[in-house]
């Protein structure tokens, strides 16, 4: 009784266009040609296991694309095992194309998708010692992954359907394969079933799971073999074991527990990370008090934020036209204003004698429009032209917006040293305070710290206590005059110079040397220190009613500027010798009294 095979398996076992890396896998074309056609069928095994034959190879054929193999699977036990595997294997049941269901074929494509030819090693001679010859081809195995590229196996119950998947196979060879299959069907009897070594088959399946890049290599083999997509091959699909039902794809209900509830992107990020946040593996619980302590410590350790310096508005450009076209200045004289306009600030400004009334003060509305593009510069030497503009608040950036500017912190504030007696130990409760001793080094340190503190206080007093005296970067250029009624035709004046950086605050004696206002007029608030450029000879020949009686006033710009440089680079000792204003003297005297009391309390009674 002849039993037809249940499943056919065909494929290339060697491709010359994809040579293997190992030299022992190369097949000599002359040797292959001498061994064909086969004199008898070759065994078909699983994973090269000798005790696991499942069918026979009825032909090997040399084509232009490579060596082609055709075999049939006839083992009943193995076919029954394939049916059982199919019902429990998700990969075997997956299909990319709508093809008829074939449990055995689909299970074979998922488990054993490659062919492997076992041939004689090239270094071993075929001739034996007794004069016999060894068979060059030993057997063909169906396996998880072959070592030669392009050895993809195609399974099917119809031999013609299997052969049409190989587009590189010549039609003449395909016809010869069908003839040989029919001849083998007639000559073969009832196949003998051998018990399958299930333990070895499971071990080989486990080993196949650790093959590196197995799916990618199978896709490469399919491309080399030039097999179209309409087949049961699983190498074209990446494994996808997680295919939940539609009911499971709906989002879970939102949690109402405030301890585990996440909102917004936090919940989405936890889901995208594999639910680690929900599982609680990457999270730790910290008490609220501990968390607040850590947060406060982190904030305390941050460096202090640097307060930006006030933005100094650029000086308005100097215009010679305002001086050249100005009429003679005197009581009631007006000024010719350039084209344009500006708005004055509330409170008005000092404009000199207006309308013959000495000491007149012009009060302006907050929105009074004046034909000037910018507020006029303050010409202090010419009281009949313009007066000092209102103080300008510190600006940040380019927007006219006043902000609060905190005073710099006292970084060098003196700290008290721990009180220790001469033996180095502390005072216990009840001990007399007269036992307190302090060495000379400690006293020197306290004196140095107090000197630095006095210097810092003096600088702060000069910077913030006398803001109206000194250089003002927001105002216009300043001029000096020797007469009470302003500029004379034979006098010379100096074009103001722009200073890239504001000079240090002036000393108190410079502020005290400011010129008094002309008689009969109200003196405006000083905004800058005048620099005289008129020589003494010219001043003596002046026709002004008031003479300069202050011999200590600097007469040259270089002398005044040198004084500024000295002030900028003065040390603490030099500053202590300079005269100060009465307000600075009072502060210094108060600090000296505090220092004396501090020393008296620390000294030995």
Swiss-Prot record:
Domain of life (superkingdom): Viruses
Region (Interaction with major capsid protein): 585-605
EC annotation from Swiss-Prot or TrEMBL: 3.4.21.97
GO molecular function, one term: serine-type endopeptidase activity
Active site: 48, 116, 139
Polar residues composition bias: residue spans: 568-579
Keyword list, A-Z: Host cytoplasm, Host nucleus, Hydrolase, Phosphoprotein, Protease, Serine protease, Viral capsid assembly, Viral release from host cell
Name recorded for this polypeptide: Capsid scaffolding protein
């Amino acid at each position: 009784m002849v039993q037809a095979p249940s499943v056919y398996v065909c494929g290339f076992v060697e491709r010359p266009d994809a040579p293997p890396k190992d030299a022992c896998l190369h097949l000599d074309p002359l040797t292959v040609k001498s061994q064909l056609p086969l004199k008898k069928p070759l065994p078909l095994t699983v994973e090269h296991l000798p005790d696991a034959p499942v069918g026979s190879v009825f032909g090997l054929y040399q084509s232009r694309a490579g060596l082609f193999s055709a075999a049939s699977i006839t083992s009943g036990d193995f076919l029954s095992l394939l049916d059982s595997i199919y019902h429990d294997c998700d990969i075997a049941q997956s299909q990319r194309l709508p093809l008829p269901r074939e449990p055995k074929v689909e299970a074979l494509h998922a488990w054993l998708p490659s062919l492997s030819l076992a041939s004689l090693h090239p270094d071993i001679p075929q001739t034996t010692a007794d004069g016999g010859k060894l068979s060059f081809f030993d057997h063909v195995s169906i396996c998880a992954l072959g070592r030669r590229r392009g050895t993809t196996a195609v399974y099917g119950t119809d031999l013609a359907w299997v052969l049409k998947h190989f587009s590189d196979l010549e039609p003449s060879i395909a016809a010869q394969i069908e003839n040989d299959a029919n001849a083998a069907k007639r000559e073969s009897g009832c196949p003998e079933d051998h018990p399958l070594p299930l333990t070895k088959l499971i071990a080989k399946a486990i080993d196949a799971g650790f093959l590196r890049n197995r799916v990618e290599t199978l896709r490469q083999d399919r491309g080399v073999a030039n097999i179209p997509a309409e087949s049961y091959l699983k190498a074209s699909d990446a494994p996808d074991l997680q295919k939940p039902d539609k009911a499971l794809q709906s989002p879970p209900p939102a949690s109402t527990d405030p301890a585990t509830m996440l909102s917004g992107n936090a919940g989405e990020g936890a889901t995208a990370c594999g639910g680690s946040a929900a599982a609680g593996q990457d999270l730790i619980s910290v008490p609220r008090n501990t968390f607040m302590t850590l947060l406060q410590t982190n904030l305390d350790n941050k460096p202090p934020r640097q307060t930006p310096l006030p933005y100094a508005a650029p000086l308005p450009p100097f215009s010679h036209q305002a001086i050249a076209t100005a009429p003679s200045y005197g009581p009631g004289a007006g000024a010719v204003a350039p084209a344009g306009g500006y708005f004055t600030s509330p409170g008005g400004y000092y404009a000199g004698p207006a309308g013959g009334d000495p000491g007149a003060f012009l009060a302006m509305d907050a929105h009074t429009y004046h034909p000037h593009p910018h507020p006029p510069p303050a010409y202090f030497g010419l009281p009949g032209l313009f007066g000092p503009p209102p103080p300008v608040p510190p600006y940040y950036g380019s927007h006219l917006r006043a902000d609060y500017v905190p005073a710099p912190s006292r970084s060098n504030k003196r700290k008290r040293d721990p009180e220790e007696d001469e033996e180095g130990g502390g005072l216990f409760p009840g001990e007399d305070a007269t036992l307190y001793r302090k060495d000379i080094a400690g006293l020197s340190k306290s004196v140095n710290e107090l000197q630095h503190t006095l210097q810092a206080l003096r600088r702060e007093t000069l910077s913030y206590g006398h803001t109206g005296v000194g250089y003002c970067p927001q105002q216009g250029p300043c001029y000096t005059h020797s007469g009470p009624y302003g500029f004379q035709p034979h006098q010379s004046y100096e074009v103001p110079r722009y200073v890239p950086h504001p000079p240090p605050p002036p000393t108190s004696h410079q502020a005290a040397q400011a010129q008094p206002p002309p008689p009969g007029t109200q003196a405006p608030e000083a905004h800058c220190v005048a620099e005289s450029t008129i020589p003494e000879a010219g001043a003596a020949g002046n026709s002004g009613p008031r003479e300069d009686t202050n011999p200590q006033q600097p007469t040259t710009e270089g002398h005044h500027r040198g004084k500024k440089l000295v002030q900028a680079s003065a040390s603490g000792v030099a500053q202590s010798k300079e005269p100060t204003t009465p307000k600075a003297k009072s502060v210094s005297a108060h600090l000296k009294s505090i220092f004396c009391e501090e020393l008296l309390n620390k000294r030995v009674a």
